[in-house]
Design a protein with these regions (language model features):
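Hydrophobic alpha-helical transmembrane segments
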Residues: 49-57, 175-206
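Generic multipass alpha-helical transmembrane bundles of integral membrane proteins
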Residues: 20-109, 113, 117
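Transmembrane alpha-helical segments of multi-pass membrane transport proteins and ion-pumping complexes
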Residues: 6, 10-22, 52-64, 84, ...
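Conserved small/polar residues in nucleotide/adenosyl-binding loops
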Residues: 236-237
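Hydrophobic transmembrane alpha-helices of multi-pass solute/ion transporters
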Residues: 2-7, 23-38, 182-186, 232-233
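Alpha-helical membrane segments and immediately flanking helix-loop junctions
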Residues: 53-56, 84-125, 132, 136, ...
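Membrane-interface capping segments at transmembrane-helix boundaries
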Residues: 215-227
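Alpha-helical transmembrane segments of multi-pass membrane proteins, especially transporters
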Residues: 1-13, 17, 47, 51, ...
């Protein structure tokens, strides 16, 4: 067992990597190219496309942060990406509060909305609310508040995970990253309007929009009690 078990594990891992990794890598690259092309659209449509696509990438078992880093996603497109990621994380966290209570709120709101993937596979309609929320907050970020994420590009794909997305926006205000400076960004003193936009787009609006849209989905019978339950999260001590 000491020899066979590690050998089998290594061989299976290598075989799967050889057969499965290439198509997964190709799909991820294609997805990244779609996001890259979306950044060339007008601010309104770019806000919708980038917000929705990067938000979806955040919840999928792929790395939205890596995609944003590779694409060097900063500026107004980075702001839209932050909006989309926050919509997914805060949206799922708040609209599933009834099922998951405080443990689910923290694990999804500050951790990752990827925890909902098993539920999404079972019932894809649970994904409607946070995705539509991201389609709303994205253009609000780009067209109303002109929210830019000029910190490290990786923060564009982090959302509220450890508050990295919000911190990236703030650091971009006071000390833009090299990638952002190369695109013309400069340090600035954020105004109250800037802070209001960040808080509304990243936290308040997703916390309101996603539950409201999910309520409509529930009334239509698309989402039922228990569809958003996180079986793997232990939150007894947080109740």
């Amino acid at each position: 067992d000491i020899l066979v078990t590690p050998a089998v594990t290594i061989l299976v891992g290598v075989a799967l990597a050889k057969w499965i990794a290439p198509p997964i890598g190709t799909a991820a690259s294609a997805f990244g190219n779609v996001i890259d092309r979306a950044t060339e659209l007008q601010p309104f449509w770019m806000g919708i496309a980038v917000s929705v696509l990067v938000g979806i990438a955040l919840t999928l078992p792929i790395s939205s942060a890596a995609i944003c880093q590779v694409l060097r996603l900063t500026g107004i497109a980075g702001g839209a990406a932050v909006a989309g990621c926050c919509a997914q994380m805060v949206g799922f966290a708040v609209m599933s509060f009834k099922e998951n209570r405080w443990g689910g709120l923290v694990s999804q709101g500050l951790g990752t909305s990827m925890l909902q993937m098993p539920n999404i596979v079972r019932n894809p309609r649970v994904w409607i609310a946070p995705t539509l929320a991201s389609a709303i907050t994205g253009p609000i970020a780009t067209c109303v508040f002109h929210l830019e994420m000029n910190g490290a590009p990786i923060n564009s794909g982090m959302g509220t995970c450890g508050l990295c997305g919000l911190i990236g926006v703030w650091t971009g205000w006071v000390s833009p990253s090299e990638e952002a400076i190369a695109k013309g960004a400069a340090a600035m003193s954020p105004t109250g309007f800037d802070w209001l936009g960040l808080i509304l787009v990243a936290i308040v609006l997703p916390a309101i929009l996603a539950p409201l849209i999910n309520m409509v989905c529930r009334r239509l019978g698309w989402v039922k009690d228990g569809d958003l339950k996180l079986d793997s999260v232990s939150y007894t001590h947080l109740r």
